[in-house]
Regions:
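Residues within the helices of the helix-turn-helix
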Residues: 34, 44-45
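Beta-hairpin "wing" of winged helix-turn-helix
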Residues: 68-77
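Short, hydrophobic-biased segments on the C-terminal half of alpha helices
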Residues: 62-63
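Charged, low-complexity intrinsically disordered regulatory/assembly segments
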Residues: 130-208
Length: 208
């Protein structure tokens, strides 16, 4: 299995085990993880609204994710409803894996990642019209079908990561202002979480 990274540039990454991967291999849990990375600190109620599940179910998912070390809770009040949840820095990292139970678990996790990002991407067309025109114009959904060697695909992936890394630096500059911004979405200086999904894979099957 080729190296896969879903991570911030940080050394704070919990150790992955078969058990941890299987517990993270859940579409809802990965959507929770993406939401926390996008918005920072949220309560279970807010996460439940973003993912379309009940707050009770959300708390169960958060408990599992906290058990394997990928979310943390700040107990900001006496009741659980007031707890503030955040994703740990470091992301979820899956390196080069060869065979065995860990590979099977990693594949399950990758399927959950693909499913979660598919849901997020599919939500944009339904809400795009409610966004200001400049954001509608800036949003990008494109696809290409290419014919490449494995070495060329490796080069393409490296180029895409380099471009993403460049803009991640801009994101880090913006992040301190995100929580305190007072401008509205119509203002050109407004900052929003942006999800970039990179998938460059061989077509999964071949005609017989």
């Amino acid at each position: 299995m080729a190296a896969v990274t879903q991570a911030e540039d940080s050394s704070i990454t919990p150790e992955l085990s078969v058990d941890a991967l299987l517990k993270l291999a859940n579409v809802v849990r990965f959507r929770i993880y993406v939401a926390l990375r996008a918005f920072g600190t949220l309560r279970a109620r807010q996460l439940a609204e973003l993912t379309g599940i009940t707050e009770t179910s959300m708390n169960r998912h958060l408990d599992v994710m906290r058990e394997v070390g990928f979310v943390v809770a700040e107990q900001a009040g006496k009741t659980r409803q007031s707890w503030l949840w955040s994703a740990v820095p470091g992301g979820v990292r899956v390196g080069r894996i060869e065979g065995g139970e860990i590979q099977d678990a990693a594949l399950e996790w990758l399927r959950a990642v693909s499913g979660a990002y598919g849901i997020i991407a599919s939500q944009w067309p339904s809400v795009a019209a409610s966004w200001p025109q400049n954001w509608q114009s800036a949003a990008e959904t494109s696809d290409w079908v290419m014919h490449l060697t494995a070495q060329q695909l490796d080069g393409l992936a490296a180029d895409l990561r380099a471009v993403a890394t460049k803009w991640k630096q801009a994101s880090k500059i913006n992040e301190p202002a995100l929580a305190e911004q007072t401008v509205t979405p119509e203002d050109p200086d407004w900052i929003a979480p942006v999800v970039l999904i990179l998938t460059a894979i061989p077509y999964p099957s071949r005609p017989r």
